[in-house]
């Protein structure tokens, strides 16, 4: 009887041990979908749990019209380090029975400091991310308990793809993660150093350009080129100092042209009328009434008087000088009037004025 009891207890212990080890393997390899339970029942249980959680979290809200005041900005340190998974995973049956060692406890702050120092000695934050092969820059960065460093987004994508919590480098299971900012700090220092280098180079180049503008070179060709540039710069500065208001000049030209057109139009109205033969006869009669016997330009007798009579000629060898009648009823020698018109061509062109009455005229040679 005792032997049978011992055998049955041993068989029960072996069964429990086998089940515990199988459960541990399923949890370790994350093969929950291989459970012997009906998958439809598992899905129904999950739906019931979700509905219960929704019912438990449902609360009635009454809109009173009052709005909560917006909270101020979070004044926490943006570079504060924190652990992402502080709670360890639940123990499996094999770990509870002592068949397998339990998972390690969460690391303390001192242990995290030692892990971080080991990562700094390895230079992981200086090197690119092992998953995406890109610099850390200002992207979120995580440190694993195995002292390896990755992008937070890259590690989450790796865990989602492999469906395991295993380090991509050393394959350590159930690691712990901590958010750090060493890569961002090193990237800021690198950017600041690069900006300072560019700024110093700009200052030195600017100082050297000003120095070249002041001190002439010793070489003859360069010295000649230096003074040519100086002379060009001074000439350009003088030209820029002049006030060349082209629009104002054009406006003045337009005003002058308008005034000249108005004057010419008035003169054309006064002097541009065509005088008929009857009008000339009236003008000649008016000139005879004035009794003009000599040219007012040369003060010599006219060869043809205003009354139509020919003047007496002293000698037969002298030819009579042509007499011209103006539209203002004045008489002159034709040669004298032409000389006067040629002399005063630039003053009253294209119209001429009578030497006596200063009015515009039209002329006609008086026939003997």
Curated annotation (Swiss-Prot):
Coiled coil (residue ranges): none
Location (main, coarse): cytoplasm
Boundaries of every IQ domain copy: 188-217
GO cellular component annotations of the record: aggresome; cytosol; endosome; nuclear body
Taxonomy, superkingdom: Eukaryota
Cross-referenced PROSITE patterns: IQ, ZF_RING_2
InterPro entries with a match to the protein in the record: IQ_motif_EF-hand-BS, RNF32, Znf-RING_euk, Znf_RING, Znf_RING/FYVE/PHD
SUPFAM superfamilies: RING/U-box
Keywords: Cytoplasm, Metal-binding, Repeat, Zinc, Zinc-finger
Entry GO MF terms: zinc ion binding
Zinc finger (RING-type): 129-171, 295-358
Subcellular location: Cytoplasm
Pfam families recorded: IQ, zf-RING_UBOX
Region (Disordered), start-end ranges: 45-82
Miscellaneous comment as given in the Swiss-Prot or TrEMBL entry: No coding region alterations in either Hemimelic extra-toes (Hx) or Hammertoe (Hm) mutant mice was detected.
Functional description taken from the UniProt entry: May play a role in sperm formation.
Protein's name in the database: RING finger protein 32
């Amino acid at each position: 009887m005792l032997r049978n009891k011992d055998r049955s207890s041993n068989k029960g212990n072996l069964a429990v041990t086998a089940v515990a080890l199988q459960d541990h393997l399923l949890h370790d390899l994350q093969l929950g979908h291989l459970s012997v339970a009906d998958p439809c029942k598992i899905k129904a249980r999950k739906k019931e749990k979700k509905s219960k959680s929704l019912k438990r979290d449902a609360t009635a809200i009454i809109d009173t019209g009052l709005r909560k005041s917006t909270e101020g900005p979070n004044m926490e340190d943006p570079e504060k380090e924190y652990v992402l998974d502080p709670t360890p995973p639940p123990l499996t049956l094999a770990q509870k029975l002592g068949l397998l060692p339990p998972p390690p406890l969460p690391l303390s702050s001192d242990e995290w400091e030692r892990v971080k120092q080991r990562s700094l000695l390895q230079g992981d934050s200086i090197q690119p991310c092992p998953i995406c092969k890109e610099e850390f820059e200002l992207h979120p960065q995580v440190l694993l308990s195995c002292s390896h460093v990755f992008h937070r987004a890259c590690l989450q994508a790796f865990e989602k793809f492999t469906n395991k919590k295993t380090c991509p480098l050393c394959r350590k299971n159930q690691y712990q993660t901590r958010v750090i900012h060493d890569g961002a700090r090193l990237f800021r220092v690198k950017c600041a150093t690069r900006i300072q280098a560019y700024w110093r180079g700009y200052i030195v180049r600017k100082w050297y350009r000003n120095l070249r503008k002041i001190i002439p070179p010793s070489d003859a060709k360069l010295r000649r080129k230096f003074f040519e540039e100086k002379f060009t710069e001074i000439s350009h500065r003088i030209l820029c100092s002049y006030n060349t208001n082209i629009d104002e000049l054009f406006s003045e030209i337009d005003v002058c042209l308008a005034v000249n057109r108005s004057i010419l139009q008035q003169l054309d109205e006064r002097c541009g009328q065509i005088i008929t033969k009857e009008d000339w006869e009236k003008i000649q009669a008016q000139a005879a009434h004035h009794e003009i016997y000599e040219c007012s330009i040369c003060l010599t007798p006219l060869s043809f008087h205003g009354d139509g009579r020919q003047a007496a000629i002293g000698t037969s060898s002298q030819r009579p000088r042509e007499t011209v009648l103006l539209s203002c009823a004045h008489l002159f020698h034709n040669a004298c009037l032409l000389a006067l018109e040629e002399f005063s061509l630039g003053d009253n062109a294209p119209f001429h004025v009578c030497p006596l009455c200063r009015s515009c005229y039209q002329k006609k040679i008086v026939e003997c």
